[in-house]
């Protein structure tokens, strides 16, 4: 076999400007590293501020114990991380939405960080007051309550992650709960594609149409038509009325005829007073023995 063109490695792609030994696995690891950095940068400032707050609180308790001061216990809400880890996810993959949540709640997270730092400095000052016996028990109780309130506020923000990550098991189930997992191709094959294709014997004006029914605004099923949520059976109803085999745009319509503006008879229909045959077309397509309105 003759040698390939100069500068092209036989059997391996050339990665411009990089070591040719750099593999797809290496690229994947680099991407993973970037993802980890994003998570760390998003959460580490809050984690660090909470760690400093914990250290200042523990130091305060030690000093208070040495000086025979009693401090009410903190009320610390539990963040149920276990249920978040084990719950049925809303989306797949499960956890990327956490980064979006943190981004959406950036202001609250920054407030938690700033408040934690202020409380840390406050606890250090209170520790000094205890050492010099310049503080009373009521003030210590207020300090404990203030810190408990902060932890409740912080825990509320973090616990709300569960509603973002996890499905609500108390909500009623819906047959399309996991439709977000459908690919466009599978949706077309199932007849549920929201834009771009009618399937089977249905019609699609705004893109969909399923089975033999027709539905523009959320209603019609079976062989009926429904533009505004009503008509069923073999009738057609634009404004909430006509049933049976008739057709009614403005409230009347009888027999097997169609009437848009007061005319059409027989098995045909009239938009402006004409049109016959057994089919019809609103946009130039139609099926069967239709007539095309735009050609009249």
UniProtKB/Swiss-Prot annotation:
Removed propeptide positions: 1-134, 146-190, 290-296
Keyword field contains Heme: no
Keyword Transferase on entry: no
Function of the protein: Causes stimulation of sperm respiration and motility through intracellular alkalinization, transient elevations of cAMP, cGMP and calcium levels in sperm cells, and transient activation and subsequent inactivation of the membrane form of guanylate cyclase.
Key words of the record: Cleavage on pair of basic residues
Organism per entry: Strongylocentrotus purpuratus (Purple sea urchin)
Protein name: Sperm-activating peptides
């Amino acid at each position: 076999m003759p040698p390939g063109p100069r500068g092209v490695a036989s059997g391996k792609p050339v990665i411009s400007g990089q070591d040719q030994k750099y593999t797809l696995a290496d690229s994947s690891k680099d991407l993973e590293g970037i993802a980890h950095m994003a998570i760390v940068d998003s959460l580490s400032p809050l984690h660090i501020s909470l760690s400093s707050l914990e250290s200042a609180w523990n130091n305060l308790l030690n000093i208070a114990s040495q000086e025979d001061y009693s401090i009410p216990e903190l009320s610390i809400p539990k963040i149920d991380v276990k249920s978040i880890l084990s719950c049925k996810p809303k989306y797949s993959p499960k956890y990327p939405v956490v980064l979006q949540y943190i981004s959406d709640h950036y202001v609250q997270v920054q407030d938690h960080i700033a408040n934690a730092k202020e409380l840390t400095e406050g606890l250090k000052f209170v520790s000094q007051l205890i050492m010099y016996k310049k503080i009373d028990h009521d003030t210590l109780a207020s300090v404990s309550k203030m810190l408990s309130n902060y932890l409740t506020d912080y825990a509320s923000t973090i616990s709300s992650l569960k509603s973002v990550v996890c499905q609500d098991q108390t909500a009623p189930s819906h047959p399309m709960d996991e439709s977000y997992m459908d690919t466009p191709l599978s949706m077309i094959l199932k007849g549920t594609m929201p834009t771009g294709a009618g399937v089977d014997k249905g019609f699609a004006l705004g893109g969909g149409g399923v089975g033999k029914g027709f539905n523009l605004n959320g209603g019609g099923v079976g062989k009926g038509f429904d533009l505004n949520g009503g008509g069923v059976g073999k009738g057609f109803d634009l404004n909430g009325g006509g049933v049976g085999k008739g057709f009614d745009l403005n409230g009347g319509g009888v027999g097997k005829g169609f009437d848009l503006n007061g005319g059409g008879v027989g098995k045909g229909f009239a938009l402006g007073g004409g049109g016959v045959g057994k089919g019809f077309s609103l946009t130039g397509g139609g099926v069967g023995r239709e007539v095309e309105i735009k050609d009249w």
